[in-house]
């Protein structure tokens, strides 16, 4: 399913219990869409700032959505009506690049200068500030068993903060990995952390042995790995699993492909979604209720209890075609992979259907048997050209400020990609920590 949004998507989140997805756009808008197995509809569109919205996160019960971006403020949005209920102006000195809800009483923000702040939703001011990074924050990973917040950065390191501690020094910080760390998730039941890098390598960190350096490196992606997402435990429990499924991650790469990859032992399961030649910036997995949520016009007289998918929305869902009704009854399509990039389209892929019949791709971007390659070839997009493209996109928006482009966004630095699908410029020798991948790891992709 494809949902056109009209602008580049920087982030997306799913409602925790109902079929609604929220997107953060270059134009500064936050757009919400309700969906079922057959169709979708707009829920609301709100513009908290004229500057780009880069980051979203949603609280546990799905009643509040937090949005932030180049405007440096944090906006709290009602997830049903789209009403902005609270704004924390000038929350950072630099544009905010990442948001993460941690607990009912805590969420985190990270900016372009590497500053991380922890916030209590009940207070206007931040409760703690961390400054161990000197480049932009690319991703957050919450480790609830230890109350640890892991952050990755463009400075080549990851850090771990104990949110219960009062000190600002991190619990741990890795050595310089000599590569931009762009995304993080967990495998092995949370025992290992997988990190995506600019060079297209998956770096594996073992939590039990510390975060000083990675213990394994898995090459194979022909371009940078900009997004990672693990399969939710609820999905693993609700579907027929195969061996190693708990060690499977979804990867979003600058070559435009969303892949399902099993890690340790490593093998490509298939291509989940294809965004053409445009980079994939964000991936999320959502398991909704299987019915359309009410839009603002339909539900404006209903109680604003923070829930969606109730009330008049059910009446509309009941009028859908027989295929959608049957899918909702059987639960097919309940789990969706949302992927977004530079193509101004949100793609929703049926996750259960994919694992019933995994794709092996269409022969794009073949890799060598060890999957490795040099990413510093002459085909990289010039950063100034990427910035000019952002400027052109922004000028097309009628209400934007003259400085409202996102040309200095960290996403511009992550757009290094090759226009040609063949990544084999130079074959490097395998490093001491790299994992041997049996056969052609990404053969045919």
What do the predicted segments below correspond to?
Residues 1-3, 39-46, 83-89, 125-130, ...:
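A short beta-strand motif characteristic of beta-propeller blades
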Residues 2-28:
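Beta-strand-rich domains and repeat architectures in extracellular enzymes and scaffolds
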Residues 2-9, 46-54, 89-96, 131-137, ...:
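WD40/WD-repeat beta-propeller blade N-cap
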Residues 8, 17, 52, 61, ...:
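WD40/WD-repeat beta-propeller blade-loop signature
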Residues 12-18, 56-63, 68, 98-105, ...:
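Loop/turn segments within WD40 beta-propeller blades
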Residues 19, 27-31, 51, 63, ...:
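Short coil/turn segments within WD40 beta-propeller repeats
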Residues 35-38, 79-82, 121-124, 163-166, ...:
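Short loop/turn segments that connect beta-strands within beta-propeller blades
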Residues 216, 222-226, 231-248, 256-257, ...:
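Terminal intrinsically disordered, low-complexity extensions flanking WD-repeat/beta-propeller proteins
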């Amino acid at each position: 399913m494809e949902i056109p949004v009209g602008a580049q998507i920087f982030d997306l989140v799913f409602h925790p219990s109902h079929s609604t997805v929220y997107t953060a756009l270059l134009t500064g808008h936050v757009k919400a869409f309700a969906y079922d197995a057959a169709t979708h509809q707009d829920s609301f569109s709100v513009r908290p700032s004229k500057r780009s919205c880069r980051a979203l996160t949603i609280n546990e019960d799905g009643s509040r959505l937090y949005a932030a971006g180049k405007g440096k403020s944090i906006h709290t949005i009602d997830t049903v009506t789209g009403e902005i209920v609270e704004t924390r102006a000038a929350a950072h000195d630099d544009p905010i690049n990442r948001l993460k809800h941690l607990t009912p009483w805590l969420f985190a923000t990270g900016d372009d200068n590497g500053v991380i702040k922890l916030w209590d939703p009940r207070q206007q001011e931040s409760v703690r500030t961390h400054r161990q990074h000197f480049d932009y924050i690319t991703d957050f990973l919450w480790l609830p068993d230890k109350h640890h917040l892991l952050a990755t950065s463009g400075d080549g390191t990851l850090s771990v903060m104990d949110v219960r501690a009062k000190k600002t020094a991190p619990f741990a910080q890795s050595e310089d990995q000599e590569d931009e760390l762009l995304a993080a998730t967990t495998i092995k039941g949370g025992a290992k952390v997988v990190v995506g890098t600019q060079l297209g390598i998956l770096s594996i960190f073992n939590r039990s042995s510390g975060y000083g350096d990675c213990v394994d490196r898995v090459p194979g992606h022909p371009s940078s790995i900009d997004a990672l997402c693990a399969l939710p435990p609820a999905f693993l429990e609700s579907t027929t699993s195969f061996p190693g499924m708990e060690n499977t991650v979804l990867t979003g790469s600058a070559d435009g492909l969303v892949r399902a990859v099993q890690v340790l032992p490593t093998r490509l399961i298939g291509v989940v979604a294809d965004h053409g030649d445009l980079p994939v910036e964000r991936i999320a997995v959502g398991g909704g209720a299987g019915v359309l949520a009410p839009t603002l016009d339909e539900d404006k007289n209903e109680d604003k209890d923070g829930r969606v998918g109730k009330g008049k929305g059910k009446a509309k869902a009941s009028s859908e075609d027989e295929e959608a009704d049957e899918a909702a009854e059987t639960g097919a399509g309940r789990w969706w992979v949302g992927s977004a990039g530079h193509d101004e389209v949100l793609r929703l892929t049926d996750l259960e259907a994919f694992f019933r019949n995994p794709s092996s791709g269409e022969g794009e971007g073949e890799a060598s048997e060890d999957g490795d390659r040099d990413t510093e070839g002459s085909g990289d997009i010039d950063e100034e050209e990427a910035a000019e493209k952002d400027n052109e996109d922004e000028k097309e928006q009628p209400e934007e400020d003259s400085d409202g482009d996102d040309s200095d966004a960290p996403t511009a630095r992550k757009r290094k990609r090759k226009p040609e699908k063949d990544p084999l410029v130079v074959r490097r020798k395998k490093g001491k920590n790299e994992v041997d991948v049996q056969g052609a790891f990404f053969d045919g992709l």
